[in-house]
């Protein structure tokens, strides 16, 4: 037994250390949240398209030559940024993001040709790919027990930053028009970006990351090493090539991929991954081109207010999704089909409004976009939960990275065919007609799948118990879901993902945790 005096002395030594750790953690949380808030303050972002049209770029140039560069370059930089984020341990990528934003606004201020604006889109694609660094970085500095709180704080900071930026832009836009200074919003945005760059230089760089700089590797002899130490009778000593192949087969990434292939047999995982890929591609095409669609009324511009309203509604719908409690094994496809059908109807309204004269077109476009974005954000935390509920933290990062890449590839292919002048080069109104058909086809496919699931359940599934209804609660899920079997990952426990999809305001594991916390 330990003497009482030694126990008291040990506790007395631990208390100051715990106090210092708590104080350090609070300071770190505040600084990260402040950086996340300031990094979103770009009041000119909602008005980039009107600014380009004021600089004598035509709608055709913006639609068919400038904007299509964004998905192309995003696809090109996505994988390198994804890997470098982990290899360089996050902080350098956050600095790169700020530098890329500086290049974006410098090109907006100084550029005069289509080539300059296309280069601006290339730098903007780097900032989009680099958003993954912030969402991963915040979880590498704290203990797992603090993940949920960190996620809620950081997510709230980002949402508040986007909302504030949109409102500020809307307030300053009329002043810019009256002052005849078309660059005022761009200069203010550049100032905020430079300040964010200064903040990023003082961020603490973590010692470990998810894949390349792991903190707790399983140190065990590989099969080829065991064969070399104790070769069997009559077996030749393995050569260099065989040892290299053995190391590759037993590498962490290969083990993760083999584990992922096994997990893809789960119907719910496949379903929500497919939703992520196909719906995200259509969603971001709408986001890219909706500002061009709004340019039909040059005398009325409430882009900032609409972005603020859509951000607020997205936060509300994402939060409300946390209270949905149904049997997802039975109703997932029906829920997805219903939401996508709503999206299809809203996009079709955006298209049809150009052919009617009895409504104020711009207000209908504003309202349908706000509702469209809110509908998409309703399913994001549900999809995040369904994907994360049976995967480890590392596998979640890999799955979301693959989903984002596939969605970007699909988005790029559609852009090449529909928008690019080397393809069909359609006007923006015709593009929205095609996008509405795209969403309608997805909805019909999901409805058919839901009907087939219902028929199977009625015929032979009544005696088979379905999984109980689940709320979107990662804390409960971490207790209910059993740990993964030994498949090369050392029995990693399921956890929510660290890496996010491309939209820094939206698709994230952090939003799931924040909403569950709320």
UniProtKB/Swiss-Prot annotation:
Binding site for folate: 48-49, 121, 131, 162, 281-282, 286, 366, 370
Membrane-spanning parts: 30-50, 63-85, 90-110, 115-137, 152-176, 182-200, 267-292, 301-323, 330-350, 354-377, 392-415, 424-448
Residues recorded as bearing Phosphoserine in the entry: 473, 478, 483
Catalytic activity: 5-amino-1-(5-phospho-beta-D-ribosyl)imidazole-4-carboxamide(in) + (6S)-5-methyl-5,6,7,8-tetrahydrofolate(out) = 5-amino-1-(5-phospho-beta-D-ribosyl)imidazole-4-carboxamide(out) + (6S)-5-methyl-5,6,7,8-tetrahydrofolate(in)
Source organism, top-level taxon: Eukaryota
Keywords, sorted A to Z: Acetylation, Antiport, Cell membrane, Folate-binding, Glycoprotein, Membrane, Phosphoprotein, Transmembrane, Transmembrane helix, Transport
GO biological process: cyclic-GMP-AMP transmembrane import across plasma membrane; folate import across plasma membrane; positive regulation of cGAS/STING signaling pathway
GO cellular component, one term: basolateral plasma membrane
Family: Belongs to the reduced folate carrier (RFC) transporter (TC 2.A.48) family.
Record-given protein name: Reduced folate transporter
Taxonomic lineage of the native organism: Eukaryota, Metazoa, Chordata, Craniata, Vertebrata
Gene that produces this protein: SLC19A1
